[in-house]
Regions:
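NAD(P)H dinucleotide-binding glycine-rich loop of Rossmann-like/cofactor-binding domains
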Residues: 98-161
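N-terminal Rossmann NAD(P)H-binding glycine-rich loop of SDR-like oxidoreductase domains
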Residues: 163, 171
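Hydrophobic/small residue at the entry helix of a nucleotide-binding pocket
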Residues: 166
Length: 187
């Protein structure tokens, strides 16, 4: 409890606003809360979010289709500035513009702590908004094109839901490889 002013000031510094869920359900289960975030561990960074990505998987976590331990934060991807680093983090510094995807759901927050290995620097010319919304789609596309099946220029690909987020990234990436792409879309 932060009953004294000096304690309140310390607690205020450690507190951040976050959307959390305490039970599964519709949008009505989303709660704005103040949480004590603390400081990053040795291999972690604290990021002040500037933009977050909204994904279907967030609704799956919220509804219980993809169960999470409750109470839980929500959201997997975002972008912002590093405001604190752990003692063993070497390739990132305070002030770096970064994006991330993954970790425990908690992107819907002013700040969050992440393993440094989940964070990438944002290249010059890419906004926080673009970086925040492309991470999960880009990683999914990379997995499909490079891990599931190594696509080459002689391949013909049928991609369902080509107008969706992953479909748009996949289509452009597949085209850059030189393969023939056939895309379907819903009505």
């Amino acid at each position: 409890s932060c009953s004294r002013l000096s304690q309140w000031n310390v607690c205020k510094i450690l507190m951040t606003k976050a959307i959390i869920i305490k039970k599964q359900g519709g949008p009505e289960v989303l709660e704005l809360s103040e949480i004590n975030l603390g400081s990053p561990g040795p291999n972690e960074v604290k990021v002040k979010n500037i933009a977050i990505g909204l994904n279907y998987i967030d609704t799956y976590h919220r509804s219980g289709l993809y169960p999470v331990n409750l109470p839980s934060g929500i959201g997997l991807e975002g972008a912002g500035k590093i405001i604190e680093i752990g003692s063993d983090v070497k390739d990132l510094t305070v002030g770096d513009n970064v994006a991330y995807a993954g970790g425990t759901p908690s992107a819907y927050a002013d700040e969050r702590i992440l393993p440094a290995q989940l964070v990438v620097k944002i290249p010059d010319g890419i906004s926080h908004k673009v970086a925040a919304c492309i991470m999960t789609k880009g990683l999914t596309t990379h997995y499909l094109l490079c891990k599931t099946y190594k696509l080459n220029s002689k391949d013909v690909v049928l991609f369902h839901a080509a107008a969706g987020g992953v479909g748009q990234v996949f289509s452009q990436w597949a085209k850059s490889i030189g393969c023939k792409l056939i895309g379907t879309v819903g009505s």
